[in-house]
Amino acid sequence: MLAPQYRLRSTALFGQTIRNGRKKGSRTVVVHVLAGGSRAEELPLPLQEGATAGPRMGLVVSKAVGNAVTRHNTSRKLRHAFRAVMEEDSLDFPVGTTVVIRALPKSATASFEELVGDVRSCIRRALPR
């Protein structure tokens, strides 16, 4: 499970990430990444007291993916895939980065390994160099 401090819950931040972030897609997911600045005033929205500066992630899993059970299972797989990618040493997320992962219908039938690979690839391409 993804720790609460890494979850994106603000509607405003979801919208800001989707509108202003970099978008990369694959067969199973579309990933929007809005990199925060290195200083607090450059962050998309201020960090709440006690929040981590690590990446925060939100999911969009529409009815096109499947019924409620399928959407929930897909959400769980994507949350775990993001956590696996986040824990890798090869990716360096800038302070205050927000990520929105939108599941495509093929994500419902994809294996966990495929989802991890697609999420990793999309985030790597979307992060600033």
UniProtKB/Swiss-Prot annotation:
Cellular-component GO terms for this entry: ribonuclease P complex
Record keyword Glycosyltransferase present: no
Keyword Oxidoreductase attached: no
Catalytic activity: Endonucleolytic cleavage of RNA, removing 5'-extranucleotides from tRNA precursor
InterPro entries found in the cross-reference section: Ribosomal_Su5_D2-typ_SF, Ribsml_uS5_D2-typ_fold_subgr, RNase_P
Key words of the record: Endonuclease, Hydrolase, Nuclease, RNA-binding, tRNA processing
Family listed: Belongs to the RnpA family.
Role, per record: RNaseP catalyzes the removal of the 5'-leader sequence from pre-tRNA to produce the mature 5'-terminus. It can also cleave other RNA substrates such as 4.5S RNA. The protein component plays an auxiliary but essential role in vivo by binding to the 5'-leader sequence and broadening the substrate specificity of the ribozyme.
Matches recorded under PANTHER family: RIBONUCLEASE P PROTEIN COMPONENT
Stated name of the protein: Ribonuclease P protein component
Organism: Corynebacterium jeikeium (strain K411)
Gene name of the encoded protein: rnpA
